Swiss-Prot record:
Alphabetical GO biological process terms: L-methionine biosynthetic process from homoserine via O-succinyl-L-homoserine and cystathionine
A GO molecular-function annotation: homoserine O-acetyltransferase activity
Keyword Metal-binding appears in the UniProt entry: no
Organism: Bacteroides fragilis (strain ATCC 25285 / DSM 2151 / CCUG 4856 / JCM 11019 / LMG 10263 / NCTC 9343 / Onslow / VPI 2553 / EN-2)
Record-given protein name: Homoserine O-acetyltransferase
Role summary: Transfers an acetyl group from acetyl-CoA to L-homoserine, forming acetyl-L-homoserine.
InterPro entries (UniProt xref): Class_I_gatase-like, HST_MetA, MetA_family
An example Gene Ontology CC term for this record: cytoplasm
Cross-referenced CDD domains: GATase1_HTS
Keywords: Acyltransferase, Amino-acid biosynthesis, Cytoplasm, Methionine biosynthesis, Transferase
Leading EC class: transferase
Any one Pfam family match given in the protein's UniProt record, by short name: HTS
Catalysed reaction, written as an equation: L-homoserine + acetyl-CoA = O-acetyl-L-homoserine + CoA
Marked site positions, Important for substrate specificity: 192
Amino acid sequence: MPLNLPDKLPAIELLKEENIFVIDNSRATQQDIRPLRIVILNLMPLKITTETDLVRLLSNTPLQVEISFMKIKSHTSKNTPIEHMKTFYTDFDKMREDRYDGMIITGAPVEQMEFEEVNYWDEITEIFDWARTHVTSTLYICWAAQAGLYHHYGIPKYALDKKMFGIFKHRTLLPLHPIFRGFDDEFYVPHSRHTEVRKEDILKVPELTLLSESDDSGVYMVVARGGREFFVTGHSEYSPLTLDTEYRRDVSKGLPIEIPRNYYVNDDPDKGPLVRWRGHANLLFSNWLNYFVYQETPYNIEDIR
């Protein structure tokens, strides 16, 4: 089944060019099934890029998925046209009475600040709490994973000596967990962050289960509440050139940045990236949608509690 997206969302045409099947609302209303309702709280600066990355992965499923985009009132995006935000994004205040089968909360470029110093901290923690009673399963990504673990479970974050930047090998700790259906024993994930959460802190909290880690990049995936919360520290959703764009941006600004590890062919930026995380990324999102959203959500969406 295709994704059901808002009419005229830029991602529609971009993904059609990649031969990915998507439909707009007008076509979806002719299909007599209840689609899964997924809300995305997109905190990344380049909204359209992140929308496209996530929608690309959510399309890899036999389920019809209806996507909505949430925004917070206490922060104004400086890198996305105002008209785009007005057209496709809705304030949390206007969505708080709604319920959703799944939610994705993205990373944000605020990780080097203390959580409480982030200007939208009060609002986003209200959203974290709201999701527990209005969403069947929530997927927290990168900074959102750190923030969610801190808010719900008191897990601290720690500054790294240098940026964790590149593609890193990971292993599953519970290979029979449904989120890992189809995974290889080892798989690769992009990371781009200045902070981390640590294994020893996760293991102290009985409500948390560590699912995956890396010798190089540490904690990768944590689950709580029987799959109603997933915390993922990497960026499986990244497109092939995202790390390249970040690297060249920082070089042009004269910032201290190393070549992303295990990313370019022969570590040569001129040769482009070697993509080895695409298969894992598609499995991660399709398994989450199937086993923790579709299989768990009630048919009557108002029954979500």
